[in-house]
Each structure stands twice: as C-alpha cells, then as structure tokens.
Curated annotation (Swiss-Prot):
NDH is composed of at least 16 different subunits, 5 of which are encoded in the nucleus. Keywords: Chloroplast, Membrane, NAD, NADP, Plastid, Plastoquinone, Quinone, Thylakoid, Translocase, Transmembrane, Transmembrane helix, Transport. It is a multi-pass membrane protein. This is NAD(P)H-quinone oxidoreductase subunit 4L, chloroplastic. PANTHER family: NADH-UBIQUINONE OXIDOREDUCTASE CHAIN 4L (PTHR11434:SF16), NADH-UBIQUINONE OXIDOREDUCTASE SUBUNIT ND4L (PTHR11434). InterPro entries: NADH_UbQ_OxRdtase_chain4L/K (IPR001133), NUOK/Mnh_C1-like (IPR039428). The lineage of its organism: Eukaryota, Viridiplantae, Streptophyta, Embryophyta, Marchantiophyta. Its EC number is 7.1.1.-. One of its GO terms (cellular component) is chloroplast thylakoid membrane. Belongs to the complex I subunit 4L family. NDH shuttles electrons from NAD(P)H:plastoquinone, via FMN and iron-sulfur (Fe-S) centers, to quinones in the photosynthetic chain and possibly in a chloroplast respiratory chain. The immediate electron acceptor for the enzyme in this species is believed to be plastoquinone. Couples the redox reaction to proton translocation, and thus conserves the redox energy in a proton gradient.
Length: 100
C-alpha cells in the first residue's frame, strides 16, 4: 500500500515541478507550488503511518505545513494582485520590477 501512496505523491510532485517550470502565469505557478506542498504532505503522512502508526508526528507536521502553505498562498496572491494593479498582467516574463 505504501508504494501506491508514494507513487501518487511522486506523480503529484512531478506535475507540480513541471507546471512550475513551464507556467508563465503567476497564479498558475502558485497553484503548482501548492501541489508540491500537498505531495510532501502525502509523503509525511504515509511515512508516519508506515514507520510508527501509534504516534501522529507526521500528521501534526503536515498540519503545520498546510498552515504555512496557506500563509504563503495569501502573501503570494496579495503580491500578484498588487503587480496586476500596476502592470495589468500576471505573466512572469513581463515582470522587471527590480530592474532600474
């Protein structure tokens, strides 16, 4: 059963990395980053259940990761909204805000 869960997690992780590398839209890149975080959470819960099912350390750690991912998504979407108000675009290749 562990192999199936790890295969699912690896598949989600690969989809997230592929989407993060190839996406030109910033909102889509944030969604792919969340997909990567969810793949990591699945791994944590699976290994926690496989190694020691009497303790819930992996589940608690994944709850912390979900909270951090929610904060990251909130901050990321706020930045995207601020950039969209200034530039009228969410394409990553059009952002040159740090150039002089």
């Amino acid at each position: 059963m562990l192999e199936h869960i790890l295969t699912l997690s690896a598949f989600l992780f690969c989809i997230g990395v592929f989407g993060l590398i190839t996406s030109r839209n910033m909102v889509r890149a944030l969604m792919c980053l969340e997909l990567i975080f969810n793949a990591v959470n699945i791994n944590l819960v699976a290994f926690s259940n496989f190694l020691d099912s009497s303790q819930i350390k992996g589940e608690i750690f994944s709850i912390f990761i979900i909270a951090i991912a929610a904060a990251e998504a909130t901050i990321g979407l706020a930045i995207v909204l601020a950039i969209y108000r200034n530039r009228k675009s969410t394409r990553i290749d059009q952002f040159n805000l740090l150039k002089w």
